[in-house]
Amino acid sequence: MDVVNPYFRSSDYSALLKKLGVELIAPVFANTTLDTPVLPPEIFSIFNMENADIFIDAGGDDVGATALGQLHRQIETAGYEMLYVVNRYRVLSTKPEETLPLLREIETASHLKATAIVNNSNLAVQTDMQTVLNAVPFAKKAAELCHLPLLYSTVPDFAVENTLPEGFKAVKRYVRFVWEDETE
């Protein structure tokens, strides 16, 4: 499901997602400049899918989580994992202490509780392994303050130097911002 976000909208990449076997459910106006967290009626079909992994990216704040809150009863009935993704280098959460109020806003708006934290600290194409390693203490402290387990830390595949240590997962980046050079 795509809850509209002006910086990254999965609906902008619907062809790529389809090619990768991902069914995208997005609001009709998802490819516009409107930033309104409204759910399309098709969203309710996810609760009838058997043997499917469902991912809902509600963004990193209470605005997207408000849309998610419309589904909280169905989500609770179906069972869920709600991962709180943190980034030490994000403006709103540069200190571990800043992650808890953001999490509480998201939980309040969504009427759901986070189950774990994922450390996705990165600096886009400038990320290297050290960038991620430097953020691990931040993520561990954030997890402690939020009373949640740290599930893992992500590392962009281009930054993986050797075999990743336990607690790290490589992620492939499929999209680029418009201002990035194609060769990056």
Model-derived segments and spans:
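Short, hinge-like loop/turn segments at secondary-structure boundaries
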Residues: 13-18, 43-44, 101-102, 133-136
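Active-site regions of enzymes building and remodeling cell-envelope glycoconjugates
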Residues: 21, 163-178, 184
